């Protein structure tokens, strides 16, 4: 076994070392030109690389190593691709492990020569879900005065179970006035059930309106939306703030590799013309709960679950409402329906550095020190950043039938 190994798969060379997958075109490629970025289909998936081609140390798959059980894979350009004339890939989180990978390429000539395009797949260790919570807010208006008691909560140590019937408002959200023994100021949703409705949670807000009295406001995705919905919500509660504290409770999910990610769902239908973009604003906001030298924030980018559009990468900072720009890279009008996941946010630790010459869409990985560079910030390896784990790798002996290459 060796610390690194390379193999050719279709038109691509893959090099694996210390959990980092470096990929370059082994042959000339000519992705079709489009108004914003060129879509490139690769002949392999994340799962096929980590399960079918490579063994890592004494385990058959990378995800069985303890260091990778709480991780999120992401795609970044190679450090050398920061030159203005070089093609580069837009950053993307990998949420689909099964289907062949895709990347969006910007810059460079129409025909990309051998090894002209190079990028990396690195596993990031996000800020743990246990270090993220929501806050019980005071009321913002007099809505509670028009509500009748419709639910109750039961408390056991650091857990609360809330049951009741929510009422649909003119704005399309659902509200419920409920009674419960004093709830600590910070909480996390363990489970949410909008019974017999088939609707999916988008956001949840709890406000304290009186002694042991609260209002819960819920936004749900899906249809139809009845006038009333019975809900059951299970919370874990905390007396102290966490690293990140959100105003709303949001539907965090686990990536297939175990890391916490926040899917960003569209709040209204959007139509985007070819080569155009739309800016989408959200009411979500969060704050730092702890004082530390690290700067926690969320890295927002596209996910590989769709090829219809691409999201401009950005850092979502504390006390700043989220706003994202979505591009249509194709030659056709696209329609994105409300409730569709348009982006993924991953909580990381950021560090300031001297501003570089990078364009605002070019996010690069320095393979020498495994750090991610982006304009005036970097993400260092370790907790809240790229995972670096020195271990031996070996190429598995399999009969590989080359899959067709499509652009």
Swiss-Prot record:
Pfam families listed in its UniProt record? Herpes_ORF11
Q: Which domain of life is it from?
A: Viruses
Q: Which InterPro entries match?
A: Herpes_Orf11 (IPR006882)
The name on file for this protein is: Uncharacterized gene 10 protein
Which organism does this record belong to? Saimiriine herpesvirus 2 (strain 11) (SaHV-2)
